[in-house]
């Protein structure tokens, strides 16, 4: 069996390395040819994991269509806003395609699974999402990690033996939508938690943001037709807790920099990698307006990042909203 990984960034490379023990070959493709060259010449992804020697069965492929043709299972690990334009250029027969990307397409408000279905023209039963609390730098070092594979359970059950390793445990779920929404929106809430930390608001505020943020995620899961209970699993609560508290979280780090007074441009530059929550919050803002639902935390993050609202003022607006029950009727 051959695995094809589309996107050789930090997460794509980590998945290629940890799963290489289960495949004869792991082929990787990336738009950045320098990354592929470094893997080809030294078995090291110098840009993202310069301290990790990759297994020798990980092989760079410079033509995306070739990688698709010679792979039995595909994992897509590229920024959400570039998935459609990348996959629309290739053809694929029905084979499992797993999204490890997290986000919502800004223009269409569609999830990654919908983008892949439209771009690739394959049966939806072959489309999956891999999501959960999983920092790439820990996964690639073989530190214990548990995630969830969401999609068609009949096909998914057959994939588990190829995705599980001694240190990488994969559970199965039939809620593709719920897993995708959780993985996408948690980045926005993590930015909020980071802003709070950057302002020095402490542990109480962070815990409150995470908890109320989870409620916002459940609202969006329901709107997209997923199971709200999914938010209490690895792809929801698990991923949110990690991303909102972990020192390796790009979204939390970005938020902290904003809270400390850096401009958006300065913060993005200092992080140095894709901050998915920065673009996802634009989609969440549109979802809020389209469906007329209250998403107060996400809304304040949007205002801070795109309307130059002072982070302290945003926090005060959250704290001084009208009195409410903890859990309101749906979509209120």
From Swiss-Prot:
Localization terms from the record: Cytoplasm
Gene: gpsA
Protein's UniProt name: Glycerol-3-phosphate dehydrogenase [NAD(P)+]
General function of this protein: Catalyzes the reduction of the glycolytic intermediate dihydroxyacetone phosphate (DHAP) to sn-glycerol 3-phosphate (G3P), the key precursor for phospholipid synthesis.
Active-site residues, Swiss-Prot/TrEMBL: 186 (proton acceptor)
GO cellular component: cytosol
InterPro entries (alphabetical): 6-PGluconate_DH-like_C_sf, 6PGD_dom2, G3P_DH_NAD-dep, G3P_DH_NAD-dep_C, G3P_DH_NAD-dep_N, NAD(P)-bd_dom_sf
Catalytic activity, reaction form: sn-glycerol 3-phosphate + NAD(+) = dihydroxyacetone phosphate + NADH + H(+); sn-glycerol 3-phosphate + NADP(+) = dihydroxyacetone phosphate + NADPH + H(+)
Organism annotation: Sulfurihydrogenibium sp. (strain YO3AOP1)
GO biological process, one term: glycerol-3-phosphate biosynthetic process
């Amino acid at each position: 069996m051959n695995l094809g990984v589309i996107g050789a960034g930090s997460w794509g490379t980590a998945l290629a390395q940890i799963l290489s023990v289960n495949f004869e070959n792991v082929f990787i493709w990336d738009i950045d040819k320098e990354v592929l060259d470094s893997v080809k010449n030294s078995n090291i992804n110098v840009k993202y994991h310069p301290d990790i020697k990759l297994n020798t069965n990980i092989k760079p492929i410079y033509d995306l269509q070739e990688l698709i043709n010679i792979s039995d299972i595909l994992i897509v690990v590229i920024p959400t806003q570039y998935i459609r334009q990348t996959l629309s250029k290739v053809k694929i027969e029905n084979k499992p395609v797993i999204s490890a990307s997290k986000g919502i397409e800004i223009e269409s408000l569609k999830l990654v699974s919908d983008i892949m279905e439209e771009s690739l023209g394959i049966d939806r039963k072959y489309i999956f999402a891999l999501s959960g609390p999983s920092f790439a730098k820990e996964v690639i070092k073989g530190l214990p990690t548990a995630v969830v594979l969401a999609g068609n359970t009949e096909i998914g059950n057959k994939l588990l033996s190829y995705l599980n390793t001694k240190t990488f445990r994969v559970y199965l779920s039939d809620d593709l939508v719920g897993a995708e929404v959780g993985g996408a929106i948690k980045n926005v809430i993590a930015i909020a938690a980071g802003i709070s930390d950057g302002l020095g608001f402490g542990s109480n505020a962070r815990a409150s943001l995470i908890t109320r943020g989870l409620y916002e995620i459940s609202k969006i899961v329901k709107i997209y037709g997923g199971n709200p209970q999914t938010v209490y699993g690895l792809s929801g609560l698990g991923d949110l807790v990690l991303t909102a508290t972990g020192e390796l979280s790009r979204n939390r780090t970005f938020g902290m920099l904003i809270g400390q007074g850096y401009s958006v441009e300065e913060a993005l530059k200092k992080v140095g990698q894709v901050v998915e929550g920065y673009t996802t919050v634009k989609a969440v803002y549109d979802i809020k307006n389209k469906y007329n639902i209250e998403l107060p935390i996400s809304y304040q993050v949007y205002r801070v990042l795109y309307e130059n609202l002072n982070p302290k003022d945003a926090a005060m607006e959250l704290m001084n909203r009208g009195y409410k029950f903890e859990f309101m009727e749906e979509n209120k």
